[in-house]
Amino acid sequence: MTEQNNPAESNTAAAVPAQDDNKIIAERREKLAEIRQQGVAFPNDFRPTHHAGDLQAKYRELEQTALEAEPVQVAIAGRMMLKRVMGKASFATVQDATDRIQFYISRDAVGEDVYASFKKWDLGDIVAARGTLMKTKTGELSVAVTELRLLSKSLRPLPGDYYGLADQEQKYRQRYVDLIVSKETRDTFRARTKAMASLRNFMAGNGFMEVETPMLHPIPGGAAAKPFITHHNALDMQMFLRIAPELYLKRLIVGGFERVYEINRNFRNEGVSPRHNPEFTMMEFYAAYTDYRWLMDFTEQLIRQAAIDASGTATLTYQGRELDLAKPFHRLTICQAIQKYAPQYTDAQLADVDFLRAELKKFKIDTNAPQFLNAGVGTLQLVLFEETAESQLWEPTFIIDYPVEVSPLARGSDTLPGITERFELFITGREIANGFSELNDPEDQAERFRKQVEQKDAGDEEAMFYDADYIRALEYGMPPTGGCGIGIDRLVMLLTDSPNIRDVILFPHLRRED
């Protein structure tokens, strides 16, 4: 069920007089007090039989004669968004979860007492009606009401601006109001739900089992990020909100589940930006007996199908530019990408640590920071890529063959020393996915963990901890495996043409209100 565009209806709430909100609230509280005196103020005995969206889809094009020939009885409820009071008959536009529909309210049909009460009702009130479908003289599908009830009194006025909430932060802070008045916002989150359902259907169709792994970790792992720290009182131990589920999911591969995935929250105690929220949704999946090449093909198909299911097409428009997910995704190495968008760099320069350090200073990069203390050519190449090429990757592009020093959990290449079988997928200049052939050599993994600990001891807060239990799991033997993580929020941004990650998170984190 989806909302239909109706030229006879506003896309948001009707404007309310520019009065002081406190005065309006006081007046509405007085009305509520009167209602309480008359009986149950918030009844819960009305059950709708229809939704506005279904009625609009099925009956909007019918003529009045057809509706008279076969009367359609309905019971429907929703929020009153428009109200036009006249003499013996009035109109109200009511919005439910699917669309809007007009009520035609005649004093003779509902009775004088109910009609008098209706005149006092306010925009935002939750109302219910029983009646028969009809067409007005202007051809608008309406409910000729025979029974009218107030189910919930709205004490606060809806935004007075015709276009809803004008302040962007207020939209995020009071998402419940934004959802009431903005069809665009409602459509965004419906698309998100469709995308999530598509991902799950695709995974199930390819033999993956959905699992749930811990949100509280004794050791943070699976990504280079700063964790949130908490304390478990019963166990009297420090714990961390998970930054990634990776190491637990790979333990399941060790245990014999050959294809697993999880869609859930990750938490990273880092900055907020149009692309970053400290609490975000990820999908990670792992498949035994696959590698990063298989993963790239699979991820491409997965994202393409999600676009079709959520948007109806794989050819999208994002921020005014076409984005074609139907075409094969590009594949470039880090150095190839740098030289494509910054062709002044030679192969020799990109292999020269001293040159790269000097070049990065031109981009205001502090190469004396802790994370660069023992940085090799791979780390420096990656930073140069981020500065010169990343934002240019508008079309879907897999950046492949990452250096081992920035890929502590990825399997090394059998043919390219110092390189791993890893990729990151970029679309519209943003990272959408990260995947690789998994490192299943326990001794190699232990050594990489030790190097991460050295970086952490040197001051790199995002370096990984040593996870002895994960090493123990690998020592039981993990089959060759490929694994990938997809940022759901960023994917939904693409599918809904949303410029800010907060636009696709129902309740994003904000600073406290003053």
UniProtKB/Swiss-Prot annotation:
It is found in: Cytoplasm. Binds 3 Mg(2+) ions per subunit. This is Lysine--tRNA ligase. Belongs to the class-II aminoacyl-tRNA synthetase family. Its EC number is 6.1.1.6. InterPro entries: Aa-tRNA-synt_II, aa-tRNA-synth_II, aa-tRNA-synth_II/BPL/LPL, Lys-tRNA-ligase_II, Lys-tRNA-ligase_II_N, Lys-tRNA-synth_II_C, NA-bd_OB-fold, NA-bd_OB_tRNA. Signal peptide: none annotated. Homodimer. PANTHER family: LYSINE--TRNA LIGASE, CHLOROPLASTIC_MITOCHONDRIAL, LYSYL-TRNA SYNTHETASE. HAMAP family: Lys_tRNA_synth_class2. The keyword Ligase applies. Residues 1-13 have a biased composition (Polar residues). It is an enzyme of class 6 (ligase). Residues 1-22 are annotated as: Disordered. GO terms for cellular component: cytosol.
